[in-house]
């Protein structure tokens, strides 16, 4: 029996949680709750300028954040051909989206994950969650629940129990306009 409902409740309460992704554990929160995002950035000691990735169960969950009218049909086809899967796309962002999510950029990084637990979590929560690697600055990203508990346990309200997808590398990041690979996967 998984602890999915406990994790969803923590998200709904504005807490920071950890969960397995394609390659490593991620830490995340409700992207629409500024206090939760600030908590996450403080936990990670992550500069606001960097922005965060949104991870979702499907494209519809990402649409409130993306200005996809700026993308051509061909660009959308290319994006959809990689999802669900381990490719994060940097896409045009809607004007009212918080700089806590976008950082210094006029775009937002988004992914439709094929990890079954991420799928379940985002479906149950009803929207995307933020995603950044579960580790303290200077330490390697966590790949097991035990590693997450040892590094971050006291700072997290819940950890979604399960295993990562087994990828050795982080997910690839690509630019939706140019199709340039920004981070090799």
UniProtKB/Swiss-Prot annotation:
First-tier enzyme category under EC: transferase
Primary location group: cytoplasm
Enzyme Commission no: 2.7.7.87
Domain YrdC-like: 1-185
Superkingdom field: Bacteria
Catalyzed chemical reaction(s): L-threonine + hydrogencarbonate + ATP = L-threonylcarbamoyladenylate + diphosphate + H2O
Molecular functions per Gene Ontology: ATP binding; double-stranded RNA binding; L-threonylcarbamoyladenylate synthase; tRNA binding
A biological process term (GO) from this entry: tRNA threonylcarbamoyladenosine modification
Swiss-Prot/TrEMBL keywords: ATP-binding, Cytoplasm, Nucleotide-binding, Nucleotidyltransferase, Transferase, tRNA processing
InterPro entries: DHBP_synth_RibB-like_a/b_dom (IPR017945), Sua5-like_dom (IPR006070), TC-AMP_synthase (IPR023535), TC-AMP_synthase_SUA5 (IPR050156)
Keyword Translocase part of the UniProt annotation: no
Coiled coil regions in record: none
Protein's UniProt keywords contain Cytoplasm: yes
GO cellular component, one term: cytoplasm
Subcellular location: Cytoplasm
Protein family: Belongs to the SUA5 family. TsaC subfamily.
Biological function: Required for the formation of a threonylcarbamoyl group on adenosine at position 37 (t(6)A37) in tRNAs that read codons beginning with adenine. Catalyzes the conversion of L-threonine, HCO(3)(-)/CO(2) and ATP to give threonylcarbamoyl-AMP (TC-AMP) as the acyladenylate intermediate, with the release of diphosphate.
HAMAP family documented for this protein: TsaC
Protein name: Threonylcarbamoyl-AMP synthase
Species for this entry: Photobacterium profundum (strain SS9)
Lineage per the UniProt record: Bacteria, Pseudomonadati, Pseudomonadota, Gammaproteobacteria, Vibrionales
């Amino acid at each position: 029996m998984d602890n999915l409902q406990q994790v969803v409740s923590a998200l709904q309460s504005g807490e920071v949680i950890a969960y397995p992704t394609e390659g490593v554990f991620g830490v995340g929160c409700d992207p629409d709750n500024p206090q939760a995002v600030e908590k996450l950035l403080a936990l990670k000691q992550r500069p606001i300028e960097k922005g965060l990735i949104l991870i979702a169960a499907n494209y519809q969950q990402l649409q409130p954040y993306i200005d996809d009218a700026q993308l051509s049909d061909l660009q959308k086809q290319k994006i959809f051909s990689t999802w669900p899967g381990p490719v994060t796309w940097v896409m045009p962002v809607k004007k009212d989206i918080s700089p806590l999510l976008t950082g210094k950029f006029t775009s937002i990084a988004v992914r439709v994950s094929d990890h079954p637990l991420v799928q379940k979590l985002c479906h149950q929560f009803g929207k995307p969650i933020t995603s950044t690697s579960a580790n303290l600055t200077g330490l390697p990203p966590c790949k097991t629940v035990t590693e997450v508990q040892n590094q971050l346990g006291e700072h997290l309200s819940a950890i979604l129990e399960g295993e990562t997808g087994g990828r050795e590398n982080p997910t690839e990041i690509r630019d939706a306009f140019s199709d340039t690979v920004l981070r090799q996967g």
